[in-house]
């Protein structure tokens, strides 16, 4: 039988730590229930995905653990190409240890 569950896409615009954790918590719950999921980073949230960013919000509480969990649960991570440009971030500046798709909104 074909999976008829609708995909949950959470668009994350802010780099606020608690909102990042909340978004990943929602995604993790849906993904654990075998619902297709995508976390779309735009606005200032793209800064969280920079390599060696000591100020990354993935250093907050269990954020890195949640990120790895949603990746293990097959969540698609997408970054807005316009947000990269607006924040003067190049594709090579993004973390290379995880698969990040770059697309337009």
Map each language-model feature to its residues:
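Short amphipathic alpha-helical segments and helix-helix/interface helices
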Residues: 27, 64-68, 105
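N-terminal glycine-rich phosphate/adenylate-binding segment common to multiple enzyme folds
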Residues: 84-105
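Short, glycine-rich nucleotide/cofactor-binding loops
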Residues: 8-21, 49-53
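Histidine-anchored nucleotide/phosphate-binding helix
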Residues: 19-39
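Short glycine-enriched, charge-decorated loop/helix-capping segments at active-site entrances
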Residues: 52-57, 94
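Short active-site-proximal "capping" loops at secondary-structure junctions
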Residues: 44-48
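A glycine-rich helix N-cap at a beta->alpha junction
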Residues: 55-86
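Short internal beta-strands
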Residues: 37-43, 77-81
């Amino acid at each position: 039988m074909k999976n008829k569950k609708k995909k949950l896409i959470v668009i994350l615009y802010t780099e606020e730590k608690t909102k990042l954790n909340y978004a990943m918590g929602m995604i993790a719950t849906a993904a654990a229930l075998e619902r297709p999921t995508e976390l779309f980073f735009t606005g200032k949230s793209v800064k969280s995905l920079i390599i060696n960013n000591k100020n990354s919000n993935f250093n907050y509480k269990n954020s890195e653990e949640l990120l790895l969990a949603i990746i293990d649960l097959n969540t698609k991570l997408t970054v807005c190409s316009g947000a990269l440009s607006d924040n003067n971030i190049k594709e090579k500046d993004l973390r290379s240890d995880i698969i990040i798709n770059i697309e337009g909104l």
